[in-house]
């Protein structure tokens, strides 16, 4: 009997020991595992707020089944399908939410000059509109403005310059708020074309217009969220983006992107001295260059995998947008036509052709893509009242508006962070 009790006591002690061990293990593991009733936290999708400017100058876009309506419907449908809580409002001197705005599925079907008559539609204060929108833009909010984006001031004295300066100040405050909230800020400016049937306002003069007119879609918010939005909406490619999309430009407070051997390769294929470049194992830096003394110059090229940059191809192919140092290196051409084996893993590589003048070699070159207002903005802008319809692709003072936004970002960046990207290539030896 005593022997049986002893055995039972040993078993009981063993069970207690196991239970204590398990409990101890649970306590120790609390730092690595969530309690059973705790759900894994995921980053929430932002809320998308779409603002349609409804001043009288916008009426001409909605009198027919225009590309404007098609693009707006495309924008609303895709945003509402991907983001929960998508909200649509009219905006002019204030923000107005009508019952029509709640019916996202049928909003465009019901859109016409009469249904847009809410608030003060007699004039446009684009700076006030920007301020109202940016005051409602936070880390988890993507704001989208659809507007013809015209300053309602004449270029008399310093009025237009003052309006652009006000735009700069409004966006600088938004950038500062974003940084205070520990994130970077971004703005995307897209120009779209649409049929227009109505009055075009050249200052206070109403001019009948039946033809194509530009308007703008401007996306503002957290850089990461805006980048994702552009990807989900397929805005990188003009063919899959908004109907009527003609130009796009993205600017952010993010520091300069440093390219490396995963985004750039050096090659000399299709050049007369192709065999004389021996690339390093990384495919970018050069282990050895054999110099032909009979050649006065040395030609080579860089293949860049930068197609995901949110910019028009025309911007990426404009060699005036690039800068190279030291001065003996010159850019002779930028194109997307050359096909090289070295760049097969790049999607739509950009080829930057270069020359070293007079065999005056340097051990390192630095290539930069400058961040500046694209040429299309100037081409699509006029700033003096004409008294008649402008060219179909032109908007009044759109350059001043974009320059105002650009200046806000430019002034908020360090001097060495104002390029879109920078690339350094080392030449280790010559013979």
Model regions and ranges:
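Extracytoplasmic/secreted cell-surface and envelope-processing proteins
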Residues: 58-63, 96-102, 151-161, 196-201, ...
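Eukaryote-biased recognition of electropositive, low-complexity segments
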Residues: 178-301
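Von Willebrand factor
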Residues: 40-147, 151-152, 187-189
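Extended non-globular C-terminal regions
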Residues: 264-431
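Well-ordered, non-membrane alpha-helical segments in soluble/globular domains
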Residues: 64-75, 113-131, 158-179
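A charged, solvent-exposed segment within the mature domains of Sec-exported extracytoplasmic proteins
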Residues: 133-206
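Acidic, polar low-complexity linker/tail segments
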Residues: 2-49, 56-62, 421-431
